[in-house]
Amino acid sequence: VYMQDTYFAQVAEQTVSNMFSNLDLTKLSKVAQLMGSMSEGRCFSMYSFDEATEKTISDAGFTAQTPSSEEHPQAGVYVTEQNPSKMGWYIHRTSKITRSACNNDGSQTYHVEYTMTNTIDDNQIGIAGAAGTYILSVNADQQGRGVEKTLIYAPAGGSLTNLQTSGGTVTGSRQETLNGKTVYASIANIGPGESVTYSFDVTTSIKAVSDLTLSLI
């Protein structure tokens, strides 16, 4: 496993090196466009421990942030695979947002459903198993399972209520504060063919001028 991780790290390092080598105006323009679209989709993020450099990076939109705009509300749903495996490849994620109320104060209320489905089947488990524990998990009791740490944020200036889960096994549900913001944390353990759905209601700030969207990882 460690040798494979080292290999992927070397590939990533070489890819980034090639991306920024031999830059001309045409290549620089393409790289900038790609970085912008990837950062919007949270496929690319940068952070610097130098405060001045980080401010420049953050102002350019390249540092991933939790929801911060009251005018353009986003609820954050951030998922991190806790099973030492490559099971994240098999976890299919879908979301649904339904407006449920236009409130007198100008805020909007929405119902949100976020579902994670473990799509791996017995045939795929057999194929993946041939690669050893690298794909399915180094932990024998978790092989083929998605173990998803899930953090849910209300939109800036808004609120989140009626959080419920269904399907699979969800443990460690708690409300805590992270970097000054309220976050709803839990662990979803999803077996082969199983799904876990998080459902909750979101009310935006009265300053909202656009519909609710989700900020996802």
Where are these regions (language model features)?
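Lumenal/extracellular ectodomains and adaptor appendage modules
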Residues: V1-I217
